Amino acid sequence: MAAAAGPSSSVKESLPPALGSTSQPPPVFDGTTRLYICYFCPFAQRAWVTRNLKGLQDKMELVAIDLQDKPAWYKDKVYAQGTVPSLEHDSEVRGESLDLIRYIDSNFDGPALLPEDAAKRQFADELFASANAFTKALYSPLLSHAAVSDEVVAALDKLEADLSKFDDGPFFLGQFSLADVAYVTILERVQIYYSHLRNYDIAQGRPNLQEFIDEMNKIEAYAQTKNDPLFLLDLAKSHLKIA
C-alpha cells in the first residue's frame, strides 16, 4: 500500500489531564495499550501525531505526564528511563520517539505511513538517521544564546533541498509519510523560537519549507496536537533557558 497523501483524523477527543506527583498510576500491564506523552514535548508529539494518523484514538489510551511534576510511579512502574514518549503494548514498554513511531506504523491497523517504493523508503531511512543531528543543529544556538550560525543555515538549506527530491507532492517523499512527522514537531518550535528570539524566519527564501509547513498545518491529525506559539516560547524560556 502506498503512503497516504495527507491523512487526517476527524476524531475529536477530550484530552485527559496531565498526571503529576500526587496522581495514582493507571493499572499498568492490564492489557490496555497506552501511549505516555507530555502535551508540550516535541518528541512525544511525534508519537501522538502518529497515533492520530493511524486512527487509534479508541485503541491506544493517551496518558499525559507532567514533566515538571513527574510522578515517581512513571519511572518505577512504567518506563525506567523516565522519558516520554513511551508505549505500553503487549506487556512491554517501548520508547525513543523515532523508533516508536515506526513501531506504531508497523504494528497497528490504519493507513500505511511509509511507501513501498524502494527509493523513497531508502530516503526515509536517511531522513530518520539525520533527524537528531538536525534537532541539535537548530537548538544549540538557542541553548547557548548564540546568533544564527552557519550550521543552522546549512541544516535548513539541506532540508529545503531534501524537500525537492521527489516532485509528486510537497512532503519529503512527495506524498505525506512518517518522515514528515519526524521533522514537523521540531520545525513547529524552532520556527517560533528563531522568529521571536533571533528575528529570523526559517522559511524565508526557502519556498519548499514554507509549503511543507503550510501543508502540514492542514493535516488535522497534526493540527490537533499543536500548542499556542507564545505558550511554547514562554515554556522554552523558563525550562530550557533558551534566549
UniProtKB/Swiss-Prot annotation:
> In what residue span(s) does the GST C-terminal domain sit?
109-240
Mind telling me which InterPro entries this protein's record contains?
A: Glutathione-S-Trfase_C_sf, Glutathione_S-Trfase, Glutathione_S-Trfase_N, GSTL1/2/3, Thioredoxin-like_sf
Q: Output the PROSITE patterns linked to this UniProt entry.
A: GST_CTER (PS50405), GST_NTER (PS50404)
SUPFAM superfamilies from the UniProt entry: GST C-terminal domain-like, Thioredoxin-like
* Molecular function terms from GO: glutathione transferase activity
Listed binding positions for glutathione are K70, V84, E96, S97
Q: Could you identify this protein by its name?
A: Protein IN2-1
Which species does the entry assign this protein to?
A: Zea mays
